[in-house]
A protein has these predicted regions:
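Post-signal peptide N-terminal segment of secreted/secretory-pathway proteins
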Residues: 78-83, 87-111
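Solvent-exposed loop/turn segments at secondary-structure junctions
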Residues: 98-102, 125-126, 139, 146-150
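Bacterial N-terminal signal peptides that target proteins for export
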Residues: 2-12
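Structural recognition of the beta-strand scaffold that forms the well-ordered cores
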Residues: 132, 139-142
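Short, internal acidic amphipathic alpha-helical interface segments
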Residues: 100-135
Length: 168
């Protein structure tokens, strides 16, 4: 094998490695970027940093309900605070499960009373001031801290923006 040919093969291998690494970084960025920045969704402002709790310290965030998520295979939850039009506080949570079945198990265990099915992700329910949906191995919950006529369309818009960012 000539020196020039070896150099050619090494160049191709290097290009393949760079492309593969870039694809991996894009997937990681997409997952960590599931929370829209301020102004990306009309009326919504991100009011704090994203916090993440892994399975070992999930109880610090959802004390009393962590066991249900652990049994369903939760890996972590990321959470972020928002404010809608300067007056309605809300929190958005993205639970990363080991499988889509785990996300489905938690989704199906949620109460269906007073819920309206909506088209988002694989399955979604809209309540008076909250939205829960699942997409692949992710379960997302958005809760607004007051109820008003504009809250439901607002959390639907935020939810759709988040669903677009989640991998299938």
């Amino acid at each position: 094998m000539s020196h020039g040919y070896r150099r050619f093969l090494a160049s191709i291998l290097l290009v393949d490695l760079v492309l593969a690494a870039g694809a991996g970084c894009q997937r990681a960025a997409r997952k960590s970027g599931s929370f829209p920045a301020s102004g990306e969704v009309s009326g919504w402002t991100k009011t704090g940093d994203t916090r993440t709790f892994d399975a070992t310290n999930l109880w610090r965030y959802i004390d009393g309900d962590a066991e249900r998520y652990l049994k369903a295979g939760v890996q972590s939850v990321s959470t972020c605070d928002y404010k809608y039009e300067g007056k309605t506080d809300a929190v958005a949570d993205v639970y990363t499960m080991t499988s889509a079945e785990g996300a489905g198990k938690i989704f199906e265990s949620e109460p269906q009373r007073n819920a309206k099915p909506v088209t988002m992700g694989d399955d979604a329910r809209l309540y008076g001031q909250s939205l829960v949906f699942r997409k692949g191995r992710y379960l997302t919950r958005i809760v607004a801290y007051n109820e008003s006529p504009e809250v439901q369309p607002a959390i639907l818009a935020l939810g759709r923006a988040m669903a677009e960012r989640l991998e299938k």
